[in-house]
Amino acid sequence: MLTAEEKAAVTAFWGKVHVDEVGGEALGRLLVVYPWTQRFFESFGDLSSADAVMNNAKVKAHGKKVLDSFSNGMKHLDDLKGTFAALSELHCDKLHVDPENFKLLGNVLVVVLARHFGKEFTPVLQADFQKVVTGVANALAHRYH
């Protein structure tokens, strides 16, 4: 999946990411850009507008939780399936989340990283992160296969 050089680049960069801020924004953007994903978050209260979603404390908190799990995956890039096995089971068997949503969230995360880091998030780093988010999405979808 990733070369040693790519792993070093993404893990070094990830150390600069503020998971609370980036996670909340990424999940919020997912819910705004792909509104059908909101059905999994009905208990989060007001999701009636982009402003409501982006300022929703529960969205921000869950976004941080999502990126905390992603951070754990960044420590286990050689075993993403094992790292995300329990979350794959939860999202498949209990929450019935469409696995396509994992890909969407990964792509939104890449957009948010580019927005936050600008020129520092080079095209090469973006390509490396695209491999990571694809690997995480596949690991989360593993239970569905």
UniProtKB/Swiss-Prot annotation:
Which residues does this entry mark as bearing N6-acetyllysine? 58, 81
Which GO molecular-function terms appear in the entry?
Answer: haptoglobin binding; heme binding; hemoglobin alpha binding; metal ion binding; organic acid binding; oxygen binding; oxygen carrier activity; peroxidase activity
**Annotated Globin domain residues:** 1-145
Q: Which residues carry this modification: Phosphoserine?
A: 43
Modified positions (Phosphothreonine) are: 11
Arranged from A to Z, the UniProt key words for this protein are: Acetylation, Heme, Iron, Metal-binding, Oxygen transport, Phosphoprotein, S-nitrosylation, Transport
The residues that hold heme b are 62, 91
Q: Which GO terms describe its cellular component?
A: blood microparticle; haptoglobin-hemoglobin complex; hemoglobin complex
**Could you tell me which cysteines form disulfide bridges?**
none
Q: In which tissues is it expressed?
A: Red blood cells.
Q: Name one GO biological process term.
A: hydrogen peroxide catabolic process
Gene3D superfamilies named in the record: Globins
Which residues are reported to carry the modification S-nitrosocysteine?
92
Give the protein's biological function: Involved in oxygen transport from the lung to the various peripheral tissues.
Quaternary assembly: Heterotetramer of two alpha chains and two beta chains.
Which family does the UniProt entry place this protein in? Belongs to the globin family.
Protein name (record):
Hemoglobin subunit beta
